[in-house]
């Protein structure tokens, strides 16, 4: 019995504890990201934001969660009930399992696999299925149109994201996310300079990938009421909401890992090494999340034709040129990484 526990149950228990240790803080971060968004946008619009529930409004996310938990879940009469219930669950679960390969600090990662980049790309591609299923199962023209918009938007910008990631792989020579971070320690400054415009394209692409302003066309209130989640209430709506914000944090962590050095200090100074890598990781992710909120508070929504034109006629040729340029420069300067 003891041998069985040591061989089979103990490893499973350790994995389960690791999953819980990542999931619970992440859900809390998602809850308080909604609070931060309302406060930041309120300050930018010269108003207070939530400030009544608890000191400085810090209990507002808990009040919102309790409210949504006790609301009545209403399923439309003509909806496909099984798919209607499954759609928000799929979206939320996919937004969580992407964290399995994100390194929080040196050696602190749930699954340090050698194809971490491909894993993240696969998960981000699958996340649109929950939205498509929601649009189809709702049996509503607004929800279905929002789902179609989301799938077209994802396809358009996933291509540019993939090409940008190829430039990172060319400079680091590995698909392992921890390896990418460690490789950034020794990259010459001119390679970082070449990757700067690619990182900007990547960040704009993840804005579109997560359906955030100025690319929130799948849920445009003025056109589609609320888009793919128009028929959802109670915990179904809450799971979509949590999935969107969990995806925001995930893509911010991905951008941090690929372009900002992950858990490494921002400058190569010896006294910064005494600060834990987890602090730098959280600081960089927090900065990118603030950029998400800043953009939402200041920029108007794109028209749908402008969104498609930007993806196919601007970003696609630009990233293709970037791949050719980076690979050519690395080849002729003999800086291609050894694989």
Swiss-Prot record:
InterPro entries: NADH_UbQ_OxRdtase_su1/FPO (IPR001694), NADH_UbQ_OxRdtase_su1_CS (IPR018086). GO terms for biological process: aerobic respiration. The chain crosses the membrane at residues 10-30, 50-70, 82-102, 115-135, 161-181, 187-207, 235-255, 275-295, 311-331. The keyword Cell inner membrane applies. It is found in: Cell inner membrane. It comes from the Bacteria. Keywords: Cell inner membrane, Cell membrane, Membrane, NAD, Quinone, Translocase, Transmembrane, Transmembrane helix, Ubiquinone. It catalyses: a quinone + NADH + 5 H(+)(in) = a quinol + NAD(+) + 4 H(+)(out). It holds the Pfam family NADHdh. It is a multi-pass membrane protein. NDH-1 is composed of 14 different subunits. Subunits NuoA, H, J, K, L, M, N constitute the membrane sector of the complex. Belongs to the complex I subunit 1 family. NDH-1 shuttles electrons from NADH, via FMN and iron-sulfur (Fe-S) centers, to quinones in the respiratory chain. The immediate electron acceptor for the enzyme in this species is believed to be ubiquinone. Couples the redox reaction to proton translocation (for every two electrons transferred, four hydrogen ions are translocated across the cytoplasmic membrane), and thus conserves the redox energy in a proton gradient. This subunit may bind ubiquinone. This is NADH-quinone oxidoreductase subunit H.
């Amino acid at each position: 019995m003891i041998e069985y526990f040591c061989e089979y149950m103990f490893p499973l228990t350790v994995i389960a504890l690791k999953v819980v240790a990542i999931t619970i803080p992440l859900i809390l971060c998602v809850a308080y990201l909604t609070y931060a968004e309302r406060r930041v946008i309120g300050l930018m619009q010269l108003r207070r934001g939530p400030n009544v529930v608890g000191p400085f409004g810090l209990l507002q996310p808990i009040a919102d969660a309790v409210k949504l938990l006790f609301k009545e879940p209403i399923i439309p009469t003509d909806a496909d009930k099984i798919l209607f219930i499954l759609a928000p669950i799929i979206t939320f679960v996919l937004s969580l399992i992407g964290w399995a390969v994100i390194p929080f600090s040196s050696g602190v990662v749930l699954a340090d696999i050698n194809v971490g980049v491909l894993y993240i790309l696969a998960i981000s591609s699958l996340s649109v299925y929950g939205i498509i299923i929601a649009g189809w199962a709702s049996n509503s023209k607004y929800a279905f149109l929002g789902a179609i918009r989301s799938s077209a938007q994802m396809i358009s910008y996933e291509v540019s994201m993939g090409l940008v990631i190829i430039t990172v792989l060319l400079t680091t020579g590995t698909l392992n996310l921890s390896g990418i971070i460690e490789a950034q320690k020794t990259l010459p400054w001119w390679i970082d300079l070449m990757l700067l415009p690619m990182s900007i394209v990547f960040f704009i692409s993840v804005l579109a990938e997560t359906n955030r302003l100025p690319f929130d066309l799948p849920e445009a209130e003025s056109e589609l009421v609320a888009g793919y989640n128009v028929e959802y209430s109670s915990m179904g709506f809450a799971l979509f909401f949590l999935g969107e914000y969990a995806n925001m944090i995930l893509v911010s962590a991905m951008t941090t890992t690929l372009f900002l050095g992950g858990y490494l200090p921002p400058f190569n100074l010896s006294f910064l090494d005494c600060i834990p890598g987890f602090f730098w990781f959280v600081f960089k992710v927090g900065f990118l999340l603030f950029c998400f909120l800043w953009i939402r508070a200041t920029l108007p929504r794109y028209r749908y034709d402008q969104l498609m034109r930007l993806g196919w006629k601007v970003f696609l040729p630009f990233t293709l040129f970037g791949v050719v340029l980076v690979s050519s420069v690395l080849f002729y300067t003999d800086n291609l990484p050894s694989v």
